[in-house]
Amino acid sequence: MLSPKRTRFRKQHRGRMKGKSCRGNHICFGRYALQVLEPAWITARQIEAGRRAMTRYARRGGKIWVRIFPDKPVTIRPTETRMGSGKGSPEYWVAVVKPGRILYEMSGVSETVARAAISIAASKMPIRSQFLRLEI
């Protein structure tokens, strides 16, 4: 699972996701990509599940790039705990994703294989997304 080696602070505010993604919204490495259409938090487990699904489907052929990294800690309070006494402890990591952001890129395979692999990865995600092809 992806997570930062070290962070400056253990806990973060939740924040809010306004607007579209202004960075990471163009295909940079591969020929095909999965682009997000709505804002969400994507957990490290979901990123890993999508990556594994794509690599299994493509077998040895093709190369895959993961374009997001979970760098936001999500804290959870223990169950049946009274209110107060501070913020909960960090439980898992998420990547904050806005519309337009590229999640995965792929190359070295045919378009049909890439489309199928990316659709399997898209089904692992909690949000709507679309398949992109690099127009040359």
Curated annotation (Swiss-Prot):
Superkingdom of the organism of origin: Eukaryota
CC terms in the record's Gene Ontology section: chloroplast; mitochondrial large ribosomal subunit
InterPro entries xrefs: Ribosomal_uL16, Ribosomal_uL16_bact-type, Ribosomal_uL16_CS, Ribosomal_uL16_dom, Ribosomal_uL16_sf
Keywords linked to the UniProt accession: Chloroplast, Plastid, Ribonucleoprotein, Ribosomal protein
Record's keyword annotation contains Membrane: no
Subcellular location: Plastid, Chloroplast
One Pfam family, short name: Ribosomal_L16
A biological process from GO: mitochondrial translation
GO molecular function: rRNA binding; structural constituent of ribosome
PROSITE patterns named among the record's database cross-references: RIBOSOMAL_L16_1, RIBOSOMAL_L16_2
Summary of subunit composition and partner proteins: Part of the 50S ribosomal subunit.
Family under the similarity heading: Belongs to the universal ribosomal protein uL16 family.
UniProt name for this protein: Large ribosomal subunit protein uL16c
Organism: Sorghum bicolor (Sorghum)
